[in-house]
């Protein structure tokens, strides 16, 4: 088989940026030529343009995730009635389902292209309904009108969250099939976006600033496809060519580099086949993720008689995930069996210490435990990615995506803990 240096790059996705306008082209760095490729070959030059596009895409994906999560957190602030708490539970459940369900790449692309403008419309509908209620702009203050507007607002928010969850899920699959450095940077930045999205509604943000930020981010995501921009970079395409040993777009890879119709398609690989030998690590990652709100609830219960737990205390525990993600960046990308047992033992000891501290009512306990859970999840994802190269990379990306989904869902459940 020919070396990757003698093969062409995978075909790029259609660059929709050419239709945006000159200013947006310059802003998204689509015009400068790629310096890492010469024709169909691969040079050893570093491509600054593709580095900038990659980082812009990751930040755009993180901002979109933050907006989606902030809407879930925002539901509880509409009203403290039980129906809104139930809606929060439904939204969290729907978000988790979106990160567990495996859709084909084609279906995800269609859903993303339709869902992004639909999100913008649903956000507009919900904001108009909320403005009419809060600003007393109704001509007739009949309570039935208010109930109808609230129902419209909640329906729009739920649709917004579900569409955003599926879009974010697809974005993370694209990140999980990229190179190690890109994936680690994405894991850290998306974790930061998660924390910002969950904590933003707790801040004293003016409605005008919130609306401007919301619609700016949504407009950017409607106009510019961050996932396609990421997959069009030379780093992503070279990674695909190196991994599969032949040029291929995401979702179109085959076991053989020929056009044999009987060759195994990468979307035909089951995700269950990618966790052989990794099942204990996957179970531990999901278990520690689920235990994050439990540890926070334990710390809340132990301090309830003396000190009331504020939203700030709850967010301090959640922010430990960002600390754990930052530490996990330094974990070696190459799988080393000699490091697995010491890392697992160390994280288990730290987790036990964190639970003990939470039992004594210290805020450091939940913070330390959530950091431990994030580090363990990242380490598990690294092992799964390293154990499944080539044709199995896409199937492994869905497993990695589900681990991230459990972590985010656990942080969202912490909202309900604060309400209890």
UniProtKB/Swiss-Prot annotation:
The chain crosses the membrane at residues 58-78, 81-101, 114-134, 157-177, 181-201, 203-223, 278-298, 312-332, 343-363, 364-384, 399-419. GO terms for cellular component: host cell membrane; membrane; viral tegument. Its main location: host cell. Pfam families: Herpes_UL43. It is a multi-pass membrane protein. It is found in: Host membrane. Keywords: Host membrane, Membrane, Transmembrane, Transmembrane helix. Belongs to the alphaherpesvirinae HHV-1 UL43 family. This is Membrane protein UL43 homolog. The lineage of its organism: Viruses, Duplodnaviria, Heunggongvirae, Peploviricota, Herviviricetes.
């Amino acid at each position: 088989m020919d070396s990757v240096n003698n093969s062409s790059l995978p075909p790029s996705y259609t660059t929709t940026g050419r239709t945006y306008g000159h200013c947006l082209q310059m802003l998204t760095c689509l015009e400068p030529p790629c310096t890492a490729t010469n024709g169909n070959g691969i040079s050893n030059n570093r491509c600054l343009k593709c580095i900038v596009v990659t980082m812009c895409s990751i930040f755009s994906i993180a901002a979109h995730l933050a907006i989606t999560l902030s809407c879930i957190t925002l539901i509880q602030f509409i009203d403290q009635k039980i129906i809104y708490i139930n809606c929060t539970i439904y939204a969290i459940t729907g978000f988790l389902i979106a990160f567990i369900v495996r859709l084909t790449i084609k279906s995800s692309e269609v859903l993303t292209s339709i869902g992004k403008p639909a999100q913008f419309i649903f956000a507009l509908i919900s904001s108009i309904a909320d403005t009419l209620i809060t600003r007393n702009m109704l001509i007739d203050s009949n309570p039935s009108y208010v109930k109808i507007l609230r129902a419209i607002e909640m329906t729009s928010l739920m649709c917004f969250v579900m569409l955003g969850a599926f879009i974010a899920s697809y974005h993370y699959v694209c990140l999980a099939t990229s190179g190690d450095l890109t994936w680690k940077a994405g894991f850290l930045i998306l974790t930061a976006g998660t924390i910002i999205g969950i904590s933003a509604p707790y801040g004293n943000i003016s409605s005008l600033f919130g609306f401007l930020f919301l619609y700016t981010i949504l407009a950017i995501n409607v106009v510019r496809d961050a996932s396609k921009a990421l997959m069009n970079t030379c780093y992503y395409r070279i990674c695909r060519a190196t991994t599969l040993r032949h040029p291929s777009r995401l979702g179109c890879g085959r076991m053989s580099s020929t056009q044999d119709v009987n060759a195994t398609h990468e979307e035909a690989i089951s995700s269950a086949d990618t966790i052989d030998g990794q099942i204990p690590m996957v179970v531990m990652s999901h278990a520690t993720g689920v235990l994050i709100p439990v540890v926070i609830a334990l710390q809340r219960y132990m301090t309830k008689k003396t000190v009331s737990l504020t939203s700030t205390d709850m967010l301090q525990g959640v922010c430990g995930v960002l600390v754990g993600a930052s530490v996990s960046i330094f974990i070696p990308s190459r799988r080393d069996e000699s490091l697995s047992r010491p890392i697992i033992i160390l994280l288990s000891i730290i987790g036990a210490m964190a639970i003990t501290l939470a039992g004594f009512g210290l805020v450091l306990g939940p913070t330390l435990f959530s950091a431990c859970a994030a580090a363990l999840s990242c380490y598990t994802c690294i092992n799964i990615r390293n154990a499944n190269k080539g044709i199995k990379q896409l199937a492994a990306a869905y497993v990695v995506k589900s681990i991230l989904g459990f972590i985010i869902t656990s942080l969202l459940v912490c909202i309900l803990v604060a309400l209890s």
